[in-house]
A protein has these predicted regions:
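A short N-terminal interaction module
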Residues: 1-97
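Short, charged/polar micro-motifs that form catalytic or ligand-binding hotspots
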Residues: 18-25, 105-110, 168
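Generic serine detector
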Residues: 19, 38-42, 99, 106, ...
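Short, solvent-exposed secondary-structure capping/transition elements
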Residues: 44-48, 104, 128-132
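A short mid-domain helix/strand-loop element embedded in enzyme catalytic domains
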Residues: 81-129, 149-152
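Conserved S-adenosyl-L-methionine
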Residues: 113-171
Length: 171
């Protein structure tokens, strides 16, 4: 299984366990937000207004939770890193589906990562000239599994597809 199946299940179990005061999707969103804010602030050299805004946002979110829950969120961040060290995949999408599940009534469906990989293999070219650009579209609006799969495909084909760059456009 891509990206450490056991660790993903552990993260999902933590989210379910922390649910009660807040819905699982709120816990998931708060956790992801705090992880992103932590990473962003940890690599920013200058502590300017943007850094302060992110720090305030982080503290405001974390302060809604008790000490044990905050410790659990930090532990989950560590598990996430371990999961990515085991392999690249749509980890967050799988954690979301495991902990919250899609809501068919509102049209939420999860594309299995194996389908995303197959789509990348079938739609991306085997070779690309150095001067040409490779572009693709993320046809869904979820966790970016198609983009992750396309990146993985390009990395595995690096002997043919050299020095590629990925740009992301939010529409």
């Amino acid at each position: 299984m891509e990206g450490g199946g056991l660790t993903k299940k552990q993260i999902a179990a933590c989210i379910k366990q922390m649910s009660g005061k807040y819905a699982p999707q709120v816990v998931f969103a708060d956790w992801i937000q705090c992880v992103a804010l932590s990473i962003s602030n940890s690599v920013q050299i200058f502590h300017d207004n943007l850094w302060k805004q992110r720090e305030e946002q982080y503290l405001a979110t974390m302060n809604r939770y008790g000490k044990e829950e905050r410790m659990k969120m930090a532990e989950m961040a560590g598990m996430l890193i371990l999961t990515y060290e085991k392999g690249l995949g749509d980890v967050l999408g799988e954690v979301y589906m495991e902990s919250i599940g899609g809501n068919k009534n509102s049209g939420q469906f999860f594309t299995p990562y194996s389908v995303s990989l197959a789509t990348a293999r079938l739609t991306l070219p085997d070779t690309i000239d150095e001067n040409k650009k490779l572009s693709f579209c993320e046809p869904t609006c979820g966790s970016g599994g198609m983009v992750i799969a396309a990146d993985r495909y390009c990395r595995k084909r690096e002997s043919i597809i050299k020095g590629y760059w990925m740009w992301f456009v939010r529409i």
